[in-house]
Amino acid sequence: MVPLWLLLLFHVIHFSHGNEIDSAASNGSALSYHYGKLYLPDDHIPYYLHSNRHIAALCRRDPHCPFKQHLQNLNSCWGYEKSCTKGHGYSYPVCDQVDFGWAKTIEESQEVFWKQADFGYVKERLAETQILCRPQEQGDSMLACSRNLQHCRATNLYLDLRNPRRGQENFKEDFLQEGEIGGRCNLDKQALLSQGAWKSPLQSWFAELQSYSSLTFKPVEDAHCDIIIDKPTYFMKLDAGVNMYHHFCDFVNLYITQHVNNSFSTDINIVMWTTSVYGYGDLFSDTWKAFTDYDITHLKAYDNKRVCFKDAVFALLPRMRYGLFYNTPLISNCHGSGLFRAFSQHVLHRLNITQQLPKEAKIRITILVRSTEFRKILNLDELVHALEAEPTFQVKVVDYKYRVLGFLEQLEITHNSDIFIGMHGAGLTHLLFLPDWAVVFELYNCEDERCYLDLARLRGIRYMTWENRDKVFPQDKGHHPNLGEHPKFTNYAFDVEEFLRLVRQAAKNVSRHSKWPFRRTRDEL
């Protein structure tokens, strides 16, 4: 007989509502509704069906299943599944040369990159998951976590917030005490407490789960809950919601968490875990629509109550050690993470952002300008006029002010750009949503050389930056309020001819890319 805890673990890992599928099998309309709720990019369907063979079996029997054409490709896999065979994975990174600090061969380099920043990262998180609190009978709870509590899954979770210790801190370490979080299960307390080496607010769930307790009652069945949450719930600790680079570390890790749990349902609750009394400023809130059908819940909404969650996930965090993508130590000379490309496709699909090609084979250039005090382009008009004189260029200048241009409108512009130009800054995170053939041109990196170069490598698009230091002209040496002279705290002018040379090179890279839609009808710029 299979142990109960193993069955429950299987249920938590496969977060995909098997009961809904079973009940739908006898109801044609319900079955169709389920298919519609999946709402994945068409290219992702066979990968999903590979890991969800029960859905594939239903589809095979159902004459109205819209996924029939994908049933021929069930060998297709993301790469982290145990059933995934070589050659059938979603993609594999490209390495141009060996980084001998990490590997000895090109093949080893590819494997390193795949594990650092691709679906191999998901595979490692799955492999290191261990059960810390085992259920003994039906109705019991369970807690299973990856190494250092970077990600956890729980069933029948009890959370007692009748005595909330809220203040100004976002992540108060002693917010929960013994008995205020836990479940009825056999807890290996020593194993739990051994996972605290990486304790830090945005790197681990240790502070929140170190007081997880083995309870004497079944939280849900024994009526110890003021509120019972039936829907799967994802707890998230969020980075800065006003900075696209930092906030998209949240969204990327939420997407990775969905892969770890084999569930892409939007019929979930997302709870923002914070111990602060304050709200959360979010300039990119439209993005949540790609992950949930509901508004984000602040943890304080449950204050003064005992809340029980039947299924809960503590999501991967935005600043984890060796995580993605804020603290990623990335091997050099490799690029093209299938995980990041899939994330881009997933978000664009669910937010209904589409590619709208021009009638003529022109290179669409978007220049992102800044309305902040520093890192402005002093001779912007001169550069724009020079580009507009080129008959093959279509130029747009944008300022992504959230009060003027909504985030979905911003994404529409970005995704329909072939060359995206901007000064160093969080706005360049938009490169995640450029088409595959695009080039991102960080006009000047302000001596922060790796940030957007590495992000472009993850996304798998070409990156360029200013090359000749003698042809860029800072307004002054920069004046950081505390650090003194600093290249990020001034403005710049650029040599026009050198600028044109670089943009023309970027345009050649676009036109020669195998996926550029006009490649076959255009021989040269």
UniProtKB/Swiss-Prot annotation:
Motif (Required for optimal activity): 293-295
Keyword terms of this UniProt record: Endoplasmic reticulum, Glycoprotein, Glycosyltransferase, Signal, Transferase
Signal peptide range: 1-18
EC number: 2.4.1.255
PROSITE patterns attached to this UniProt entry: ER_TARGET
Keyword Flavoprotein included in the entry's annotation: no
Disulfide bonds: none
Enzyme class name: transferase
Entry's localization field: Endoplasmic reticulum lumen
Pfam family, one: Glyco_transf_61
Motif placement: Prevents secretion from ER: 522-525
Catalytic activity: L-seryl-[protein] + UDP-N-acetyl-alpha-D-glucosamine = 3-O-(N-acetyl-beta-D-glucosaminyl)-L-seryl-[protein] + UDP + H(+); L-threonyl-[protein] + UDP-N-acetyl-alpha-D-glucosamine = 3-O-(N-acetyl-beta-D-glucosaminyl)-L-threonyl-[protein] + UDP + H(+)
GO annotation, cellular component aspect: endoplasmic reticulum lumen
GO process annotations (BP): protein O-linked glycosylation
GO MF: protein O-acetylglucosaminyltransferase activity
Organism domain of life: Eukaryota
Chief place of localization: endoplasmic reticulum
Glycosylation site positions: 352
Matches recorded under InterPro entries: Glyco_transf_61_cat, Glycosyltransferase_61
Family: Belongs to the glycosyltransferase 61 family.
Function of the protein: Catalyzes the transfer of a single N-acetylglucosamine from UDP-GlcNAc to a serine or threonine residue in extracellular proteins resulting in their modification with a beta-linked N-acetylglucosamine (O-GlcNAc). Specifically glycosylates the Thr residue located between the fifth and sixth conserved cysteines of folded EGF-like domains.
Protein name stated in the entry: EGF domain-specific O-linked N-acetylglucosamine transferase
Gene: eogt
